[in-house]
Every structure is written in C-alpha cells, then in structure tokens.
Amino acid sequence: RNAMVKLNDGISGEGNAVVDLKGLPDTKTTDFSTLLEERLRSMLFESSAVTFDSFGKSLGEMGGIAEERIEGSDFCSPSVQMRVSPLGEVEILSTHDQLLGGPSGQSFLGSQFPADPQYGPLIAREARKIGERLADYGALGRFAVDFVVVRNEQGEWESYAIEINLRIGGTTHPFEILQFLTDGSYVDEEGLFRAPSGKAKYYVASDHLESTLYRAFTPTDLFDILIGHGLHFDQARQTGVLVHMLATTGENGRFGVVAVGDSPAESQELYQTVQDVIKKEAEEAIRPRNSRELV
C-alpha cells in the first residue's frame, strides 16, 4: 500500500508526502533498501516548492511520522472540532467535511458544515474518546481531529482518525462567522447548528477563491457584486454569502467566502453561484471598454 509521511509542524497538508510502496519485494531481499530509497526519492509532495532534500531537512529538524495511507470506496475526509474547558470537560463544537485539493488531495481548501449525517455521529463519538484522553493529559482549549472515512465491503462506513491538530484550525473562523451572523448554536445531540428560530443552518466555506483576474477588485467591488446579484447575507432570512480575507484581494487575487443556506443543497448552490458570478464580473472588468460597448 501507499504510505503517508507527515511533518510534525506541517499545516494545510503542505507538510505531507505520499510514498508509493506498491509492488516492493520482501524486506529480506538484497535490493530492498535500494528500491525503497528510489521510492522515497520519488515521493509526491503536496507543495510544489518542496524537494526531497528540503523535506528531509525539515523532517530532521521537526520530526514526523510515517503511516499507512487509507484508501477505499467513497473516500471522504471529515473533521471534528472540540474544546477542553478549564474544568476538564470535553465539548464537541462542530463537524465538517473538508474540501481538499493539491497534487495528492492533501491541501485544505475549505469545508462544508456539518459533516455528512451518514458518518457525522460516528466520527463525533470517536473524537470524543480522543478528547477525553487529551483532557487526561492536561490539554486545554480548542483542537481538532481529522478523519478519513471509507465504506467497507458491507457498505458500512469505517472511520480512521489520522491527525490531531492542537490549535485553532481552518474550520474555526467560518463557524464563528456563522455564530456571529445568526446568534445560533451547535446542538451536539443532533449534529446540527440551529438559529434562535430553531431552523438548521448549513454552509460551504473556503479561503481559496483565487485568480489573477480578481486583482481588479477592491473589497467594495466585491460587496457591490454580491448585493447587485442578491447573493449578500440577508439578516432577515439568515442566508447568503459573506466575503472575508479581503486584504489579499488586490495583491494576490484571493479572498474567502462563507455561503450560508437552510439546507446543504442551498449552501452548495450559493457557493457555486458566487464563484461563477465573480469570475464573470472579473472577465467583464478586464475587457477593453470598446469591446464591452459593442456587446
């Protein structure tokens, strides 16, 4: 099987590398070490800026771990966010399905809240066990556990905890944005977030809406586009899109969005629509003026 090598201090999957171990001979064969070294030198890094030598140097400095890469049918990568109080109580804050990309699908691009109900309760139960053990060790504050889930031969979901992040992660700020916008709260027993009205809320969020085309926009432009297309967050309905991380738009053409809906389908539709609309507006903005007038 393939193996995953992870740096201890890597973030967003950029400290990960995949090693192809398929077809290697028995460890007792004379050329095993040579063949293994060849596989290691050809490992696939998640970041294009990383080389074998630089990865090896980082591994020596900060340490890391090698583990089996879980593969299977209907592969998904959810996560559970938790908190340990000063009294040692473990609280489930949220569950998410992670949106991953990059060369080997290890880079964190965004998230969908909550995690799929088919396996959300499963990973929450397993995460609580981990949280209670961490509390016994004296952990305090926020942390998250990343999982992979796959279907077994019987069609049932199996979960594998693959990483503990003892820090605030990429799913923290979109969840807090939802709390701020709606004044609602997460109901652990249901695995849902409910507004004061009792209505469940869902979102898709990303920090990686990025294109050189978007450098043409100011933060005000983005707000105007959302309002002009009726995509902005509507406080009355408590649905819509909020943009953030706007300081990087002019320089890098990058910003973030949180698309809030009353169902998973609505939040996904809003997320896709805002991408389509902003791309179209960006293409229109850079077209020569006389070309626009002829249309």
Residue ranges and their predicted role:
Residues Q98, E126-R133, F180, T273, ...:
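Generic, well-ordered alpha-helical scaffold segments in large soluble proteins
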Residues S77, V90, L140-A144, E156-A161, ...:
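Active-site lining segments that contact anionic ligands and/or coordinate catalytic metals
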Residues E156-S185:
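Active-site loop ensemble at the mouth of alpha/beta enzyme cores that anchors a bound cofactor
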Residues N2-E14, V19-L21, D31, L35-L100, ...:
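Phosphate-binding site of ATP-dependent enzymes
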Residues L24-P25, Y271:
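Low-complexity, highly charged intrinsically disordered N-terminal segments
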Residues P78, L93, T172-E176, Q268-Y271:
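Short conserved micro-motifs at the rims of enzyme active sites and ligand-binding pockets
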Residues S48-S73, S104-E156, A195-H232:
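A long amphipathic alpha-helix within ATP-dependent nucleotide-binding catalytic cores
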Residues D183-V295:
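Peripheral (often C-terminal) accessory segments that flank ATP-dependent C-N-forming ligase machineries
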